[in-house]
Amino acid sequence: MSNSQANAGSSGSADEPTLNPSGSATLVPNLTTTNASSQATPASTIPQQQQPQQSQPQPQPQPPPHIVGASTADAGGGVGVVVAGGSEGVNLDSSPRESGDDSEDESEILEESPCGRWLKRREEVDQRDVPGIDCVHLAMDTEEGVEVVWNEVQYANMQELKSQEEKMRQVFDNLLQLDHQNIVKFHRYWTDTQQAERPRVIFITEYMSSGSLKQFLKRTKRNAKRLPLESWRRWCTQILSALSYLHSCTPPIIHGNLTCDSIFIQHNGLVKIGSVVPDAVHYSVRRQWDRESAREQERERGAHYFQAPEYGAAEQLTAALDIYAFGMCALEMAALEIQPSNSESTAINEETIQRTICSLESDLQRDLIEKCLNPQPQGRPSANDLLFHPLLFEVHSLKLLTAHCLVFSPANRTMFSETAFDGLMQRYYQPDVIMAQLMSGGQERQYRLADVAGADKLEKFVEDVKYGVYPLITYNGKKPPNFRSRAASPERADSVKSATPEPVDTESRRIVNMMCSVKIKEDSNDIIMTILLRMDDKMNRQLTCQVNENDTAADLTSELVRLGFVHLDDQDKIEVLLEETLKAGVMSDGAGAESSGAGVTTTATMAALEQLERNWSISDADKTMGSSMSSPATAMMYVPQDQQQYQQQQQEADVDQSGTTSN
């Protein structure tokens, strides 16, 4: 199955998307995303490069700095970025760059992250007055070769940063754990205190190159097209699915800045919300602006951001604030534009809102929006309740349920590798494949795939389900994380190590394939075990540790689960693999050639856990599995049973075919 359509931000073409009957846009950018991180080093700033004189001729104009994505490291989700804004794409209405000099100026590297992975560029991102975010630039992910967004929150002084640092870190650490297909991803954050008079919090978010929903609605209105009700329903369902996920977190996360400018639509109809401004960031992290300038800014933003009546007066934001904002977004999506009653004013008042609601043709559409815009916060429904509104609720078809079972079932994600899954699709996704045989009146009738209407779009449908275009709203959605009361700093260790080890996050990904080998070091006769895991998000994880003859497979597996290296449900099959490896390797004195591990390139390495009696070395990568295991005498490989049956059937079919040919 093709992986060219990923629900992630990256560089790509800035062509204008157009609406098709299915509610999708036809823009097809190259998309990649990553969830790998690197160990931090002290922050540093790259000096600006000297620009060439204008009088010197350029040998060849440079193309616009749109970097085509490399390999896909995380196709499903990764920890989210819903957080604090700045994930928006460059304004698609702006004119293209006219010369190579302009391209070089915007591609100039201004700064790098402490870990050296992200490079801040001069090119700014149109972030549309996201409150609390002072500076937004495009940046390059040097490990994945894709564009990301560099966001900065500036403090008035060092004292203000220190007073809010603990709360800020707690908020951002929680946001790092978010994982939802309709939420823009959040990659990393750190603090910069090198300049005491200008301390900053910097965070990296996913770059959405396809543009915002606001831009899409403007182009749709310019082309004199009405948004189909089915597209409106699909977009509302995806937005509410993301809000329900945020509000179900413990503690709940309030978006605080939901508008059509902070909602992004991709080429396949996938909708993502970004520019999250949690209450801790909005009220505590941002600079202490002058009251007059703050009020002026609120008046200016009133023309673009539709906030609940209680916004600003409440001491603490609630989920009802996001529901009101969603109602305004739903109204704008249905009407394509909310025009002020007075041509001389850009403010949106109650009269304008009611006139726009009355212009809608669907009674159910008006009812849903009016419930969201209830002036009383306690009278507004929750995001989960809105998913069961008569206009949005539907009994899912067997086709959709089957696709979700095929794509998201833990058993299928574990038992089928991507190669085996693609092989099955190629084998059974053919027009002449017999889907059913019915006996009627003593006669047999066969139904083939070609007889089913729309079967030619089945592969695309399964792919859209995988990327979150068709969520299941009648069942419990993805369970959000329960945040810890305190999280460790991502960029610096505590100066005094606690006697109690920090809690370790559990692994949520499942294992698709795994290999294990043991070898004896020639200089010390130490037994080294290496485990290579293929996760369901296409990432590889390599684990290495020293073992002895007293170690058992059960003890080793329990330790892997306790440290959060593997999923609890994968414990049994890992234990079987380790037991077979120890029997073949340790008990036979480690016979066999030594595994060299050549060809493996890691993208992140975690420090060994010193407080444990055994030190595990772990590295994550997105390369192929087989390159690090070169010794068949000491390596064991786990092959799912269904994949074994499929391979056996393929071999038998090949034998039958060769026998028929020879005859």
Swiss-Prot record:
Positions with biased composition (Polar residues): 19-46
Phosphoserine modification, residue list: 489, 495, 498
Stretch list, region Disordered: 1-112, 481-505, 638-663
Gene Ontology cellular component terms for the protein in this record: cell cortex; endomembrane system
GO molecular function: ATP binding; protein homodimerization activity; protein kinase activity
Residue numbers bearing the Phosphothreonine modification: 500
Acidic residues composition bias: residue spans: 101-111
Record key words, sorted: Cytoplasm, Phosphoprotein
Low complexity: bias regions: 1-14, 47-57, 81-94, 641-652
Summary of the function given for this chain in its UniProt record: May play a role in subcellular trafficking between the endoplasmic reticulum and Golgi apparatus.
Name of the featured protein: Nuclear receptor-binding protein homolog
Organism listed in the record: Drosophila pseudoobscura pseudoobscura (Fruit fly)
